[in-house]
From Swiss-Prot:
Known tissue expression: In seeds, expressed in the embryonic axis and in the cotyledons. Not detected in leaves, stems or roots.
Region (Disordered) residue spans: 1-101
InterPro entries named in the record: LEA_5, Sm_Hydphi_plant_seed_CS, Small_hydrophilic_seed_prot
Amino acid composition bias (Basic and acidic residues), ranges on this chain: 7-17, 38-62, 71-89
Protein known as: Protein SLE3
Protein source organism: Glycine max
Pfam name, any one: LEA_5
Assigned protein family: Belongs to the small hydrophilic plant seed protein family.
PANTHER family reported in the protein's UniProt record: EM-LIKE PROTEIN GEA1
PROSITE patterns tied to this protein: SMALL_HYDR_PLANT_SEED
GO aspect biological process, one term: response to abscisic acid
Induction remarks: Down-regulated by drought in 30 days after fertilization seeds. Not regulated by drought in leaves, cotyledons, hypocotyls and roots.
Length: 101
């Protein structure tokens, strides 16, 4: 039991020194903060995937993967003639609203 507590304290100390000790916890100033950040980021991604659907989430990932420090994913897709179907980005709520107009 003491080793678990000691390990937790060691991780917390490393986090306080600015090291990321939890995957997805970047920016947290303590072990607990990093755990909360990682959980929120994971949950946010899952929620977004549910909103967009698998195809939309995949298309958005393709576009984001093309981005660089100099150019957005949209600019690179246009330059390299890569087709990104943004109609798949629409959430279920947006589609319902557009149909009612």
């Amino acid at each position: 039991m003491a080793s678990h507590q000691q390990n937790k304290q060691e991780l917390d100390e490393r986090a306080r020194q600015g090291e990321t000790v939890v995957p997805g916890g970047t920016g947290g100033k303590s072990l607990e903060a990093q755990q909360h950040l990682a959980e929120g980021r994971s949950r946010g991604g899952k929620t977004r995937k549910e909103q967009l659907g698998t195809e939309g989430y995949h298309e958005m990932g393709r576009k984001g993967g093309l981005s660089t420090m100099d150019k957005s994913g949209e600019e690179r897709a246009q330059e390299e003639a890569i087709d990104i179907d943004e109609s798949k980005f629409r959430t279920g709520n947006n589609q319902d609203k557009n149909q009612n107009k």
